[in-house]
Amino acid sequence: MTAARAAPRPGLVLVTGASGFVGRPLVAALARAGYVIRAASRRPQAAAVPSGVEWVRLPDLAGEVDWRPLLAGVSDVVHLASATHDEPGMGVEVYDRVTRGALVGLAEAAKAAGLRRLVLISSIRAQTGISSDAVVTEATPAQPTDPYGRSKLEAEAALRASGAPHVILRFVRIYGPGVKGHIATLMRLARSPWPLPFSSFRSRRSLLALENAISAVRFALDETAVAGETYVVADPDPLALPEIMAVLRAAIGRRPAVFPLPAPLLETLLRLSGRADLWQPLTQSLIVSPAKLLAAGWRPALDTRTGLAALMRAEQDRPAGT
């Protein structure tokens, strides 16, 4: 294992996409850890302002962006702002402008300004689709399957070609407070009193705790040895669907209560209920190995079982409407 070497501490860190699901807790965590933060968001007024954080408005990334004012006095950048894979009405051209085009301008401005490091938050979708028969590592040939993934891969290539000092982090699906999508659906199912037809499914999927995503960003900012590298980032322990449901239900004091159902029948039921989108994420494997990042010295803050259980309890206790 290669021992991690601490780089000089960043000065002023620009975080783009700072009011989103990852951005807001990232900004708060970095501020608590003593980083000086300039937080850029399309809706800065919508975010609570931690002490010592400067909030600025992020221009529309689909248009021309002058990055120089945002980079004034900045030593490092964490670039989270991007088109999301589930945003309605997103075409190939918009993905290209918002994800790749904006990154090209940012990388050029960062290099011209002599920035210390640009940490690009990318996605595992730059490397693979929503399932994979083999364990995914950084050495797995990149084969994105949709415009979102292709735009992420092209943004990564543009950053490397720019010559700007950088680290690229490819996150898998993140869970944490306020999570939406498939994880939120599983949590709703876990709260129901009914047995669920999941016990036959043994495919495993990698997830990423929000706390672990934040610790990976801090690692990318602080460590000398990771400069110029690309990492896939996931909790080390992928889980099968019955295991996830058991963890979620145990967290609120319930038995797993799962039973077998033939896969074709479950697929049909999902389609009839209008949730065909759940079929692959729930029943097909996507195992992502963070071995390279672990070998560099990153240590996740918590394991998947602990993280999912804590999230389930927190969401259970959350007052309605918050």
Language model segments and positions:
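Substrate-positioning beta->alpha
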Residues: 150, 179-185, 199-222, 228-232
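Conserved C-terminal active-site "lid" loop/helix of NAD(P)H-dependent oxidoreductases
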Residues: 210, 246, 269-300, 306, ...
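Conserved Rossmann-fold NAD(P)-dependent oxidoreductase catalytic core, especially the SDR/UDP-sugar
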Residues: 104-147, 167
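NAD(P)H-binding glycine-rich loop region in Rossmannoid oxidoreductase-like domains
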Residues: 57-101, 105, 109, 126-127
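N-terminal Rossmann NAD(P)H-binding glycine-rich loop of SDR-like oxidoreductase domains
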Residues: 12-33
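Mid/C-terminal beta-alpha module of Rossmann-like enzyme folds, strongest
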Residues: 219-278, 309-322
